[in-house]
Each structure stands twice: as C-alpha cells, then as structure tokens.
Amino acid sequence: MLSSVLFPAMRTLLLLKYVFSLISLSAICCQTVSAIPVVSREGLPMTLSDKCAEALISDVACDPNVLDFKPGYYYSPEILQRACTDTCKSALDSYLDRVKSSCGTETIVGPFDLEVSALIVPGMRKDLFQKTCLQDNGRYCNNVAATAAVIADPGVSRFNYLSSVPPGTVPPDPCDIQHVCLYVDDQSMRNIWATIDYYSYWVLYIINAGCYNMHRLNGTELCISAPGQKFVPGDATDLPGATVTTPVPAPSDAASGSNRYCGRWYGVKKGDYCNLIVLKFGITMDNFIFLNPALNSNCTNLYAEESYCVLPVGDINTYSGKPGYVSTPTGSETTATGIRFEDLPDATENPYPRPPPGPPIAEGTRDDCNYYFDGAEFQYNVTNTYWNSNCQIPPPQVYRVDPESFESWNAGLGNISRPECSFKPGFRYCGRYYALSDDSDEPTPTTPITTSDDPTSTSATPTTPTTSSKPSPGAPTMTGQPSACNKWHTVTNGESCTVIPKTFGITLEQFLAWNPTVKSDCTENFWAGYAYCVGVKTLGPS
C-alpha cells in the first residue's frame, strides 16, 4: 500500500525538480552580466580625495554574487559557473589598477578600527574571487571542499535519513522527536500521511534556511535535540585550587607590589598577556590588578619572567581595600586595669592661654593654610623695583613658593602681576599652604629691592635664609636629581611611587620633577634600594 502511493509521488516530485533545474540552468546561461559597483559612496570616509573615491565606487563587470563571496562559505555549482568568469577576473584586475593609480597612499578605516591602505578594498575582493573560484581539472575546489565537509560531519544533510526502521528497533543515538503535521491540499500527500507508520523516519528533503519547504516534510519525524546521551556537567573543575585558606610562599621572582597574602603564583612567560592569564585562572581582570597593584589599569606593563598573584586566600572581598574588609585585632585580649573615666576627679588646672584668632581671612583665600600673614605686613612703595605690585613680593622672597600656587591659594587677588593688586590691611592671606622641612627658616617679611637712587622709594636688602648641611642620600641615586635636595627616601620592596608623595606631603608631579629618570607610570627606573628626592629646600615643599 505504501509503495503504491509513495513511489509515484516521489517520481512526480523528482521529475518536477529536474524540469525546474533545466529551466534555471537555461536562464543562467542566457543571462548577461551587468556592471556593478563594489562599494557605495556613502560607505567611504570624507577624507578621501575625489579622484580616489571615484575609483573605489567605479563599476566592475561581474555577477552580483561576487560581492557576496565570504571566506569559508560554500556555493552551488550554478552560482560558481555564473560568477567565476574570465570577464570578471579581468574586471577585478583593472579595478585594482585604477584604485592603485588614483589613491596612492591614501588610507581608510579597516577592520578593528585600524588605518589601512585604500587598496584593501580591491585587494580583498580579488583575493576572495581567486580562492572561491579556484579549479582543479575542471572542478571547483569550493564544491569539493563542501562535499568533503558533509561526508566528514554530515550534520543536517540529505544523507541523514532512513527510509524505514524495523518495529521494536531503538536508534543507537535517541533524541527528542517532533512529528511534522501540516495541512496540505494535495490529495496524494494526504494519502502518504495516512499510510506512513509512526516509526518511519522518511525525510526526503532537509529544511532550508527559510523553512519554506516544511510542506515537503509532512508526515515525517524530525530530531529536535542533540542526539545521543545528554551532557551532565560534573562537580569537579579544572581550575586548580578554586579556594584556598592559607597563603603560599612568594617566589623569588615575585613582581614588585604584588600582594604577598596570595594563594597561588604564576610565572609569566614570553607571549603571555593579561586576558590570557585571567581566563586561564578564572579570575576577573579587576581582581587580578587588585592583587598586583603595580599593573596599570590597562594591564600593559606585564613583565615576563616575573610571578604574579592569581588567586586570593579565601574571599577576596575580605582583603584591605575591598568592601568586606574588617580589621581584626591580634593577640590575646587583656583586662583593663586602673580607674574608670567616670571615677576620675574633675580638672582643676586653669587652661593655658590661647592666642587670639587673628584677623579674618581675606575673601577667596584658603581656610586650611599652614601659614598666614596679615595684609598690613606688605604695604610698600614698589616704584622703581623689580615688582609691579606688593602681591608679587611674598611668594618668592618670603615663602619660597611659585606665583601660580600663591594665586591659587589666594584666588581673591587674581593676577598678582597687575599693578593694582594689593593686600588689605587687617585681613589674612595664605602665604604657604604646606609646611617646609624642619631645617627651614620661618618666613620673614622683606622689603623690596630698589633699582634706582630715588630717595623717596623704600629699599632694603632681602633677608637671606640661613643654610645648613644637606643630608646624605644614604643609598645609590639616579641621575638628574636636584643638587638642592634636602630630603631623601630609600625605596623598599613593595613600595609604590604613587604612595611615597602622599607620605611626604608632596604631589606626584613634584616627585617626578625631582626624579626625572622615573617614568610617569613608575614602570622604569623606580628601583628598590635606591634613594629618591622627596624635598627641595629652595624649590618647593618637602
């Protein structure tokens, strides 16, 4: 019964398919190829010259399928016969020559936002054409490769079906089955549907990309899950030591600054990079940089032949600097002895005399300066002197600071080089925001130096601060450090050059200016055991 209905229907379908194939081939053979543009003007950058742009958007005498060629894709013999012509090959060669002569060294933005030559457009198109249209003894290699891929791994191919399976037979690789049931008008298809046994696995056609041939699968059963045994992930992980409770000793080549409270170290080899390491050890980039603070935010200063921490001890959120950190006291608890605060007698000593608060702070002046002065101290006649106004006298002569810093601390003065700039008597101004070293002199107001014999002008000789012997660095130093340096610091293992300036009350810019051999990100010439300048008596804070 099945064969009497099935095989006539199959012969009818195959005959129709053969007729339509002949019609399609005749249409392909008779169709002419028109010229097509390789790229559109809208896709080109505005920086290209008109001559180069015209060359890139010029037409080539190729089939439109040529523009759809992609590496690793397979195409039907009909498409290749239509697209792979000598005319198209010559057109692509001419297109390359036109772009080469018109564009010269002009560039466009290529893959990964890289700047590349404009020749990449015709070059890539010609390369894809040659690889896709490659032939051997009259056969397209693209078709041979497609057949080999199907045989090696059929997947959902037309060879993956059985006409029938004996009753009671269990497929070796069972899968979830979906019975296809579609309403069709063709009486013969309904007859086939009525006679097919439930266990039949007749699939004459595969599903195409748009599912437009589902009606041909009426009455069949399709596998809708991966065949075979379902994958069940195990409990074990291939990441060694996912959680450790005790730190391991740091190796001798441990990177400077890396956290020594570490559960695992990894020695970086040539060719390694940060993304590879974090994937290998299952750690996030943020945590990897947190455990190795010498690495910059982009992780571009990873050094080979050094070991880095790749696993925290316990929960990384309990580390100092993380939200879960709790400072735990060490040692045994002791019982407090002595008198309770509540039982202490009331104080009877008279408080020491406190100095008066002084004049009010001038408008725009900082309220947290280390040293203030009264505006009445600088009321001089600066005619025929080096200065345009009294505001220029305190910074270099008394407080040894640069004018820019002085202006920022006293924003209400504005530009201190203006002749109309002056201090208001009875108001305090910031003379120095920071404290100088212990051996520095206390600032003393100085009258300006006269430059003429005008008896009406006030003149005086500025006070010269006393000097003291400069301290010895106490360790090897770098070149370029100032001779006036009066404070040194010897770097120890694990120290960061971003922390040292904060320790000594200076800025990172000052530290780098006094130690010019140190790179701005402290990755070069910042060595343990070397002394670095952290204070200059005559140039700034220490």
Swiss-Prot record:
The LysM domains bind chitin and potentially related carbohydrates, and might be involved in damping host defense. Residues 1-35 form the signal peptide. InterPro entries: LysM1-like, LysM_dom, LysM_dom_sf. It is found in: Secreted. One of its GO terms (cellular component) is extracellular region. Residues 264-310, 487-534 form the LysM domain. Glycans are attached at residues 218, 298, 381, 415. Residues 439-484 are annotated as: Disordered. Keywords: Chitin-binding, Glycoprotein, Repeat, Secreted, Signal, Virulence. GO terms for molecular function: chitin binding. SMART domains: LysM (SM00257). SUPFAM superfamilies: LysM domain (SSF54106). This is LysM domain-containing protein ARB_00327. Pfam families: LysM. Might have a role in sequestration of chitin oligosaccharides (breakdown products of fungal cell walls that are released during invasion and act as triggers of host immunity) to dampen host defense. Gene3D superfamilies: LysM domain. Residues 443-472 have a biased composition (Low complexity).
